[in-house]
Amino acid sequence: FQEWSEARELDWYLLENPDHKHMQNWVKKLLHIYQKNPALYELDSSWGGFEWINANDAERSIFSFIRKSKDGKNNLLFVCNFTPVERSDYRVGVPKHKTYKLILNSDDAEFGGSGKERPVNYKSVSKECDGRPYSFAYPLPGFGVAVFRY
């Protein structure tokens, strides 16, 4: 295939390749999530819109953080695994005792992942983790990214 050029159309035939189609699905979903979630853009240039949950899990190469909206509602929790090892019961600390809704899972089949069924809602419990008073466990896939709204 040819390198991208503003002078010609994209190589749309590449979408016949499943890997290219999976990447298109991923980018499409990311753009949709960006448009629908003010936490990703309202406080983009302020530290008030970002909070680390855990940036120090070097042993497992996993980090987690929160993106916040101005009104504090519909914040997003990101959990990212940078190893091929699935963490079947990865516990992540969270700031509030509520339900966290999975809105993006990179392991979904539409993105080329395993397509394993996972619950959508995760209720936090009063179990301290990552310096937070509450937490929940999630089956984090290898090389996976999970995004939760709360």
Where are these regions (language model features)?
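Carbohydrate-interacting/catalytic domains
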Residues: F1-Y150
